[in-house]
């Protein structure tokens, strides 16, 4: 990088190469050295990343196709790591011309007049990445460029001179990676202009045709939903994008947990003072899995991985708020804290008509309930099967206590000691947990005691009501009778 003139650069035997060759050769080194070039991308090791590596080795332009929250843009940004750390360019060039292969009038003129004394500068790979979100208002001038009348007047040039062109984002991404997010949102006529650049290597601005063999690695991202809702990718352009790679959501709870743990932004105080058991972490992830197969949610829109990240952050913050209000120095996440993640869920799901009728909050609570029911069978016997077996039902004493008219409210106003006292009121609840999980800490035992109540409610053995900042548990049939009685009273009021 000490070289500052073209002559000095030539003396080092520097060889020019295209950005796609650069990516390919650096990827070959990475693969041979068994290094990781896409750090932080989890769950794609056997699917997306091998296909992406193949596309780079083939020197293809790439389309990443997938639902929202599948790391498409992040993958594109990480491709920068495969570029050389620094590359030389003709100093002063708007489009960072290669000193050994100039394409702009400015660079050619500089080299023609100054020869080996032409000044060169060095461009870091972080500056060789350009990203544009496709929106309906994007114009050809934004992407490709336009004639600049002020420049023409100032330099006293005619519109036939290429120096009057003000280059757009794509020419300025020469020798770089250029990413267009949500490609179908781009108007068809602008997509055609892109196709022309990919195919013919020239640009046309207001009738001015300029041969400009740009060296660009194009990466496009798109959501399959866009093909039917907002727009489509024009066929000639899609045909010129050589590799289409399908992304996907995490295929297991373990992978999903790793992503959430990596992306969730927690403070040092939250990490130190708030304990989150593996059960509640799994529940947060299971909620997303339930959402991805729910009849209330538009599956074409998808359920982003951001849902679990936001939900986990809210879960920790709900526990933190409870801790601060009660004046305690530390706490652990309870299942009742799941009431605090409802805003994170409702903001991340697109409902179909049936879901709109139910309401976002009701759909969110339904998803939480389904997640509890799915995981409950991994920790305890199925309550429905337990009733039919000849062996003693482990839940009989618990349900009978509620049948006698007792109830338990678990809200965010309870301190840790009050929380323990409320759960210990239920006979045999502690013994049931210890029977199946004898080696747990006190906090884990209390968590599973509450989990049993939630699980029995999901299996219709108990009634669960959403309270402000928590849940209330009571007898199933008693709550149904009270609900019917309240309805009769309401009818009497109107007679």
What are these regions (language model features)?
Residues 260, 284-288:
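Short alpha-helical scaffolding segments that buttress acidic/His motifs in well-ordered protein cores
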Residues 75-78, 83, 99-110, 225, ...:
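Hydrophobic transmembrane alpha-helix bundles
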Residues 2-254, 265-282, 295-299, 380-495:
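Conserved ASCE/P-loop NTPase catalytic core
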Residues 332-420:
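Extended alpha-helical coiled-coil/bundle linker/stalk regions that scaffold oligomerization
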Residues 31, 147, 291, 319-322, ...:
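Generic structural signal for hydrophobic core residues of well-folded globular domains
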Residues 270-277, 290-367:
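C-terminal helical "lid" subdomain and adjoining coupling/linker elements of P-loop NTPases
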């Amino acid at each position: 990088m000490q070289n500052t003139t073209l002559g000095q650069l030539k003396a080092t035997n520097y060889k020019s190469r295209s950005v796609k060759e650069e990516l390919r050769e650096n990827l070959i080194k990475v693969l041979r050295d068994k290094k990781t070039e896409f750090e932080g991308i989890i769950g794609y090791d056997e699917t997306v990343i091998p296909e992406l590596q193949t596309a780079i080795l083939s020197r293809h332009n790439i389309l990443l196709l997938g639902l929202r929250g599948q790391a498409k843009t992040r993958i594109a940004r990480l491709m920068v790591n495969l570029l050389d750390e620094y590359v030389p360019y003709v100093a002063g060039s708007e489009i960072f011309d290669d000193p050994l292969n100039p394409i702009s009038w400015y660079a050619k003129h500089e080299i023609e007049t100054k020869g080996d004394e032409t000044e060169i500068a060095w461009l870091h790979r972080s500056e060789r990445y350009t990203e544009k979100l496709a929106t309906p208002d994007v114009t050809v001038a934004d992407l490709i460029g336009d004639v600049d009348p002020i420049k023409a007047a100032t330099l006293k040039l005619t519109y036939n001179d290429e120096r009057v062109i003000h280059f757009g984002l794509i020419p300025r991404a020469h020798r770089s990676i250029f990413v267009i997010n949500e490609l179908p949102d781009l108007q068809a006529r602008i997509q055609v202009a892109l196709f022309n650049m990919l195919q013919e290597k020239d640009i046309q601005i207001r009738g001015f045709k300029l041969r400009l063999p740009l060296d660009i690695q194009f990466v496009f991202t798109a959501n399959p939903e866009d093909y039917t809702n907002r727009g489509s990718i024009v066929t000639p352009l899609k045909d010129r994008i050589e590799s289409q790679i399908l992304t996907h959501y995490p295929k297991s709870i373990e992978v999903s947990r790793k992503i959430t743990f990596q992306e969730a932004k927690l403070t040092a105080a939250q990490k130190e003072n708030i304990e989150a058991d593996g059960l509640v972490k799994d529940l947060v992830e299971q909620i997303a899995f339930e959402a991805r197969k729910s009849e209330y949610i538009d599956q074409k829109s998808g359920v982003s991985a951001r849902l679990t990240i936001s939900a986990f952050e809210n879960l920790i913050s709900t526990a933190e708020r409870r801790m601060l209000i009660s004046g305690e120095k530390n706490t652990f996440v309870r299942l009742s804290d799941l009431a605090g993640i409802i805003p994170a869920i409702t903001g991340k799901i697109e409902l179909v008509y049936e879901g709109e009728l139910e309401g976002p909050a009701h759909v969110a609570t339904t998803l939480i309930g389904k997640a509890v029911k799915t995981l409950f069978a991994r920790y305890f016997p199925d309550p429905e099967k337990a009733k039919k077996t000849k062996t003693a039902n482990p839940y009989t004493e618990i349900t009978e206590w509620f049948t006698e008219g007792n109830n338990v409210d678990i809200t965010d106003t309870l301190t840790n000691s009050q929380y323990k006292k409320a759960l210990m009121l239920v006979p045999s609840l502690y013994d049931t947990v210890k029977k199946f999980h004898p080696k747990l800490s006190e906090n884990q035992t209390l968590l599973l005691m509450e989990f049993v109540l939630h699980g029995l409610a999901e299996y219709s053995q108990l009634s669960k009501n959403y309270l402000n900042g928590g849940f209330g548990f009571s007898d199933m049939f008693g709550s149904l009778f009270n609900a019917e009685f309240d309805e009769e009273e309401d009818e009497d009021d109107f007679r």
